Amino acid sequence: MELQLRDHTEGKLQPSQERLAEKALAQAAERLDVPEQAEMSLTFVLNPEIRELNRDYRGIDRATDVISFAIEDDDDLANLPAEIRAELPVELGDLVISIDKVTEQALFLNHSADRELGYLLVHGFLHLNGYDHEEPADEEKMFTLQEEILDGLGLSR
């Protein structure tokens, strides 16, 4: 999977956090059998930027931890021959994570910043791949898978 990583944190994002992001998303993609030609972007921001996004796209005027922007399937692609569709990149969408919230929530929840970052990465990635937690059965399925992936990364609770 191709990952486009952007850092808008004014130096707050650590190289170890970038490596964790790449590893966590690669492991989650492997677990979900995401095609190799899949593409997504991950942008790390500070609270003011994610607050603006949250306000503009969700109508909630406060900072949040992660926002996922899934790319919907294009019905026009369904009309293409299967051989051509197989060659096209699969665009999953975009994740935006507040590095400020990673730190704040790790302190509040009394676990490591790596655990919090891993959680937000995997949680957002699952949303990009169609998982949600609106219904109890869906929540159980998503959260179980999420914890299995985090356990595989050594980021157990």
UniProtKB/Swiss-Prot annotation:
It comes from the Bacteria. Its cofactor is Zn(2+). One of its GO terms (biological process) is rRNA processing. One of its GO terms (cellular component) is cytoplasm. InterPro entries: MetalPrtase_cat_dom_sf_prd (IPR023091), YbeY (IPR002036), YbeY_CS (IPR020549). Its EC number is 3.1.-.-. PANTHER family: ENDORIBONUCLEASE YBEY, CHLOROPLASTIC (PTHR46986:SF1). This is Endoribonuclease YbeY. It comes from Limosilactobacillus fermentum (strain NBRC 3956 / LMG 18251).
